[in-house]
C-alpha cells in the first residue's frame, strides 16, 4: 500500500536525487576547470538549474518505475492509497484517485511509512525562505546566499551542491564540534578542509537561536564559542 511514489523517501526525495544533483555539480565544475584536464571550451559555461533539477527528477522517476516493474514481476499487488489501522489485522485504505475506502485483512501488517521533515520551533518551514529537503531538491532558481542548519549527510550534500553551482555564500552550521558527526574523525576532517577550500563557511559548535524572516533575507542569530554572531 503506497500513496505516493514507489521507493519511498530515499529513492524519490533523498539519496538518489541528491546524488544526481551532485553529479551535475561535478560535471559543471569539470567544465569550469576544463583547462586543468587539457581541454578548451569555447564560450561561457552556464548552469541551467531547471535542467539540472529535471535530470535529477528523471533519474528518480526511472528508478521508481523499475521498482513497480519488479513488484509486478514478483506478483506483488500494489494498492495506491493511504492506509489506516482500524482493528486487529484490518486496515482501511482510502484510494488516492477517487477517495473510495476499501477494507483489507492480513495476518501480519508491516508499518514502513518513511519520514517527513520537522520544523525547528523558531524556524517553521514556509517553503519559501525556510525550506526543507524537498524544496531544496527542486529549486526554480539559485539563491545568492544559503544557510544549512545541520551537517549530517543531507545537510552536507546540499551545502556542497549549492556552493558548487555558484551560490555566493553558503553557511553549514553544526551544533556539535565537527561536521558529519556520525562519520570517522579523519573523514570529517578531510571533508571539512575540502568544504572550506570550496568556499563553504563551516560553523561548528554553533547553535542557531533565532531566524528572522521579516526582511528581504533571513537573518540568523547563532551562538558560537566566540559569542553571538548574526549572519544573513
Task: Identify the function of each model-found stretch.
Residues 3-142, 168-171, 175-180, 184-187, ...:
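Glycine-rich flavin
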Residues 147-148, 172:
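Hydrophobic Val/Ile/Leu positions in short beta-strands of Rossmann-like dinucleotide-binding domains
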Residues 232:
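Conserved NAD(P)+-binding/catalytic subdomain of aldehyde/semialdehyde dehydrogenases
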Residues 155-156:
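N-terminal Rossmann-fold NAD(P) dinucleotide-binding loop
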Amino acid at each position: 500500500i503506497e500513496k505516493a511514489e514507489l521507493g519511498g523517501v530515499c529513492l524519490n526525495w533523498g539519496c538518489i536525487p541528491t546524488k544526481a544533483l551532485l553529479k551535475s555539480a561535478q560535471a559543471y565544475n569539470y567544465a569550469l576547470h576544463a583547462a586543468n584536464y587539457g581541454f578548451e571550451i569555447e564560450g561561457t559555461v552556464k548552469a541551467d538549474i531547471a535542467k539540472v533539477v529535471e535530470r535529477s527528477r528523471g533519474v528518480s522517476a526511472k528508478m521508481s518505475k523499475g521498482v513497480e516493474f519488479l513488484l509486478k514481476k514478483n506478483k506483488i499487488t500494489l494498492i495506491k492509497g493511504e492506509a489506516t489501522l482500524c482493528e486487529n489485522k484490518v486496515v482501511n485504505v482510502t484510494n488516492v484517485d477517487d477517495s473510495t475506502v476499501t477494507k483489507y485483512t492480513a495476518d501480519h501488517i508491516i508499518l514502513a511509512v518513511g519520514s517527513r521533515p520537522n520544523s525547528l520551533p523558531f524556524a517553521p518551514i514556509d517553503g519559501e525562505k525556510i525550506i526543507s529537503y524537498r524544496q531544496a531538491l527542486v529549486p526554480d532558481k539559485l539563491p545568492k546566499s544559503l544557510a544549512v542548519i545541520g551537517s549530517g549527510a543531507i545537510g552536507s550534500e546540499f551545502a556542497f551542491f549549492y556552493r558548487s553551482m555558484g551560490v555566493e555564500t553558503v553557511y553549514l552550521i553544526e551544533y556539535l564540534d565537527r561536521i558529519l558527526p556520525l562519520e570517522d574523525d579523519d573523514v570529517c576532517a578531510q571533508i571539512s578542509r575540502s568544504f572550506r577550500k570550496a568556499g563553504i563557511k563551516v560553523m561548528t559548535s554553533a547553535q542557531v537561536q533565532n531566524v528572522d524572516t521579516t526582511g528581504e533575507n533571513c537573518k540568523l542569530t547563532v551562538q558560537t564559542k566566540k559569542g553571538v554572531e548574526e549572519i544573513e
